[in-house]
Structures are given as structure tokens and as C-alpha cells.
Amino acid sequence: MRASLQIRWKILIVLLAIGIGPLLISAWLDTRSVSALGARLAEQSGQALNEQTRRNLELVAENYARRVERERQLIELALRLQAREAGTALRAPAPATDVFWADAFDAAVPALALVTEPDKYRARANDGSVAPVPVAFDRQVFFNPQGTERLQLRDDAARLTALTSLYREIHTDHQNVIYRQFIALASGLLASYPGHGAFPPDYDARKRAWYREHDRSGDIRWAPPHIDAVSGRAFINATIALHDPDGQFVGVAGINVSLVDLLQSLTLPAALGSDGEALLTYLIEHADADA
């Protein structure tokens, strides 16, 4: 009896081994298949996600490019209007009006009604430090470089005060793009809006690259990115030559665009994460430039 039970147990064990073995092998093969399928799906999903992200970035870049192009057109329109009004003002009789030179802003003359916007308007000191500089949105500042006489420049300065209302209107509507507007005459006179002080003692607009390199053809010129001598900020300038009725060059009208303000206006989508950054590139040469 006992021998018979032992034989039965042995037979049962053999049968279990025969039956379970294939099941284990099948389960192992199924697991490998599922793992391989999961890996393929993950790879395909990753590729699809990367492709979708690439397309989204291309769309964002295209939208930003269109936006920057609209801003460029706006700035050029404002600049042409500024140049036209400056030409008209310079041909008119000099009005009897107050003219505030840079030292009046340095002295914070009460009539200027100066205000401070520390996050935007700053000036660079001689030691290289940068601090907020008060500005006047109802006044232009006039600056005469070393070697020039204010008395000889005052009439043109008085004439250019006629542009203040135009500057104020443009600033109100487009202050997120336009940082500063100015007129630099061949006589050395510089008119700038909004009014501010803190000019370097040796400053002369006629020595700046955007003035010296202007083609004087009447077309708008965009200067490469550069550091502003007064604020220490990175700017790009749009400039256009001014001419008298005889066609003689008399100066340059210009608009400063702060690269910081421009980049801050280009907000990346939240889906790209907090580590995403916006940047502008300056193309100095292209392989197909002569094609």
C-alpha cells in the first residue's frame, strides 16, 4: 500500500513537471514579448513626442518671427514720422520756449517733474556701476558735446521741442518696444526723449558708429547690437538721415530698441518648462549670400 502511494506521488510530480514546464516557458516568452513591445511603443512614443515638440518649437519661432517683423515695421513707421516732423521743425522759426540741457536733469530741476523707473531707465557711472536715472516724459533733454556752444545750438533745440508731443504719444502706445527716440544734428546738438541726465562728459553722438556709418541715402539703417554709452544696456538702433531742403545732410533721427525688453516680450510656452530661454541671433554671414 505504502509503495503504491509513493508511486502515485512520483507519477503526479512527473505529470506536474510535464504540465507546468511548458506553462513557465510560455509565460517567460510572453513576458519577453510584452517587454519588447513596450520598448518599441516607448521608442515610438518618444519619437512622436520629439517630433511634436519640434513642430511646436517651429510654430513658436515662426510666430515670434512674425511678431518681431511687425515690431520692425512699427518702429520704421514711427521713425519716418519722427524724421518728417524733425525736418519740418528745423525749417520753422525758433519758438520762444524753455530748453532744458542735460545739466538741468542732473540737478533735478523741479520744473522737469522727474520720475524714476528703476527697472527700465538706468545710467552707467564712471566706475562702471549702473543706477536708476530719473527721466521726464514731458520733456526732451538737449546735450551739447565738448567744443560746441549752447548759444549757437539753442535755436535748433527750441525748434525740436515741437516733437515732444509726438514722442509722448508714441511712448504711451509702444513703450514696451521703443526705449528712446533722438535727433543728432551735424552741429553736435543731441535731442533725446524721454529727457534724462547722466551723459558721459566726452559723449558726442557724431562719434558713435550708428552716426558715422550711416549711408545718408535716406533709407532706414539698422545698427548691429551694441552697448549704449549712457544706460549701459544692449540696444539695436533704427536710424535715418535728415536732409535740408537742398538735400544736404544735417543729421540723423533714431530710435533705440532695448534687446532686454524685446526678449522679455517673447514668452516661451509653459509646456517647455522653466528652463527654456528665448534668444535672438545676429546673422553676420550666410553660405548662400551670393546665390
Regions found by a protein language model. Give the residues of each.
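Solvent-exposed, extracytoplasmic
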Residues: 158-174, 252-291
